[in-house]
Amino acid sequence: VVVGLSGGADSVCLFLILEELRKKIGFEILAVHVNHGIRGEEAKADEEFVKTLCEKKEIPCRSVSVDIPKMAVEYRMSEEEAGRTARREIFEQAAEEWGGTRIALAHHQDDNAETFFLHLARGSGLRGLGGIYPVNGMYIRPLLCVGRKEIEDYLKGREMPYCIDATNMEDAYMRNRIRNHVIPYFKENINEKTVEHMNRSMDQLREIWDYMERQTESAYQICTCLLYTSPSPRDS
């Protein structure tokens, strides 16, 4: 399993859980850290934290540096999109070179709620409103069933430190604005369990989409079969 390890609370939690499961099940782990070239010394400190954690747990670690601002300009995309693209390429390359069959990412319920708002605002259809899938190809997201607070409480209980990305508190990115303002507003003024309820709705939307996909494929196969088995006009 290739695990994305930024050093933040979410990825550290996932790393520790996989490390515990590794002892019981017997699979191998490769931690991959991506330095986005944005936060200077803070990013270097995160990288050192990740390397130290992996050494302590005797888990191999691969660290890759990318100039995300430069990549964003070259490919005419936002830094958020450039970061996602770079991470995906790095994780998949690591999996291919190392022989990994799964890539584990630390998305959780709060991330999924943010994604729902983003997709809703952009006019996404049923597939997009289903949010993040727990399993999508070789990608797995074991923490999608828990929230950010549960993750932080888990780390606190284990007395495990983690890195804090100060840019997450800035409103420079749309996702940050949703995280820092929209979701807190819903929790405080509408329903304190907004995130949990949204994730439940997204689960149902994913089930509906998957059902429609299966039914569409089944109908297509029937139509194809009828097309190739129907007698031609000359035979009638």
Q: Which stretches of residues belong to each language-model region?
A:
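Helix-loop "lid/cap" segments that line or gate small-molecule binding pockets
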Residues: 181-187
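Single conserved hydrophobic/aromatic residue that forms the stacking wall/gate
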Residues: 228-236
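An accessory alpha-helical subdomain
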Residues: 187-211, 215, 230
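Short acidic (Asp/Glu) and glycine-rich catalytic loops that position anionic groups and cofactors
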Residues: 159-161, 224-227
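An N-terminal amphipathic alpha-helical segment
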Residues: 217-224
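Core alpha/beta nucleotide-donor-binding catalytic domains of modification enzymes
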Residues: 1-181
